[in-house]
Design a protein with these regions (language model features):
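A structural signal for short secondary-structure junctions
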Residues: 32-33, 72, 252, 259-263
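DPxDG-like acidic metal-binding loop motif
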Residues: 90-114, 133-144
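ATP-dependent small-molecule kinase catalytic core of the GHMP/sugar-kinase superfamily
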Residues: 2-6, 12-14, 20-28, 113-254, ...
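Glycine/small-residue-rich loop that forms an oxyanion/phosphate-binding "nest" at active or ligand-binding sites
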Residues: 85, 99, 121-124
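ATP-binding N-lobe of GHMP and related small-molecule kinases
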Residues: 1-88, 105-114, 302-305, 309-325
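Short Gly/Ser/Thr- and Asp/Glu-enriched loop/turn motifs at secondary-structure junctions
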Residues: 8, 135, 260-265
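Short, flexible, solvent-exposed loop/turn segments with mixed acidic/basic and small polar residues
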Residues: 38-41, 255-260
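Short glycine/threonine-rich catalytic loop with a Thr-x-Gly-x-Asp
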Residues: 89-92, 96, 194, 257-263
Length: 325
């Protein structure tokens, strides 16, 4: 019997303190969205991977790491049925790695915490946002890296009537892990900026989330994103990537708050779900007018973590959904 895993994707709302001034580096926040990976994992005589591009190597590494840590073997048929685009800022590597690791753990009756699983799979070295989005969904905030995986500080349901206008322009991909390694391992950032980000999170963003105040949340989100951009300006040519600034300028004027997810190129604007059709039409006109090729999507919040079910249960649910018996 096999397992079916459906993950979220995540947008990254920023890193707090790269300086490590209080003994912990980074600290991250993010939101889980619908539309992640769907992966099927079956026991098999040998490893067979049905996936495209870099997903193949990510899967092989996950299988090897699980076997090295837990002796779970390498005999699996792993098929990626739906995927998150690579290197666009939506957390594909972490979601796929955790999906494969979770399935292998379940198939071998292993009870492993999400933190241990992430550590084994080499995830969470700089940010816990993707790990906790996978585990719990919703809005997540971690407490920064000291030793091991950054601890989860807050998990909060994200309002279902809120959404994100996602824009993925056809430009240079975001940095991959090897490209970002020398940056993230170096000394950079501004402690005063980190203090202002922290202030905005604690007394701005989080109260607005608790009170379901979309305007206040968006205002603080935009401010936090600009501040985070100051940490990374020397590496990306400014507070945001130059090739997304025109889109971000539009999002900043038309939505409640806007930002760049991780290294981009995905950018987003906070909206009400009911506003998507109107705003996406206006945005597509704007993109066409300026000759910008981009994919525009509705980013729906997902307030549950990855779904893991047996293949039989998955098929039964599918049959019921189409009116079968």
């Amino acid at each position: 019997m096999g397992m079916i895993i459906r993950t979220p994707k995540r947008i990254h709302l920023g890193l707090i303190d790269p300086t490590g001034s209080l003994g912990r580096r980074f600290g991250s926040l993010g939101v889980a969205l619908e539309g992640g990976y769907e992966v099927k994992v079956l026991p098999a005589e040998r490893l067979e991977v049905k996936a495209e591009g870099e997903d193949v190597e990510t899967i092989k590494k996950a299988v090897e790491r699980m076997n090295s840590a837990f002796g779970t073997g390498t005999g699996y048929l792993i098929e990626v049925r739906k995927a998150i685009p690579r290197h666009v800022g939506l957390g594909s590597t972490t979601q796929l790695s955790l999906a494969v690791g979770t399935a292998i753990a379940r198939l071998n009756n292993l009870n492993v915490s999400i933190e241990k699983l992430a550590e084994v799979l080499g995830r969470g070295k700089n940010s816990g946002a993707g790990i906790y989005a996978f585990a719990y969904g919703g809005f997540v905030l971690d407490g920064g890296v000291k030793e091991g995986i950054p601890p989860l500080i807050l998990h909060e349901e994200f309002p279902g009537e809120w959404a994100f206008l996602l824009v993925i322009p056809e430009v240079k991909p975001g940095l991959d892990e090897e490209e970002e390694k020398p940056i993230m391992s170096g000394n950079f950032g501004d402690v005063n900026v980190a203090m202002e980000i922290s202030h905005r999170i604690l007394l701005g963003l989080l109260p607005a989330l608790k009170e379901r105040n979309v305007r206040a949340f968006g205002e603080h989100l935009s401010a936090i994103q600009r501040l985070v951009g100051r940490h990374f300006a020397e590496f990306q040519g400014g507070e945001f990537r130059e090739d997304v600034e025109l889109i971000l300028d539009w999002l900043g004027k038309k939505t409640y708050g806007a930002g760049q997810s991780s290294w981009g190129p995905t950018v987003y604007g906070l909206i009400l779900k009911a506003e998507f059709q109107r705003l996406s039409a206006e945005l597509n006109d704007h993109l066409k007018e300026h000759g910008i090729r981009a994919k525009v999507e509705l980013g729906l919040p997902r307030n549950t973590g990855a779904e893991v079910v047996s293949e039989n249960a998955f098929l039964e649910r599918l049959i019921r959904s189409v009116g079968g018996s």
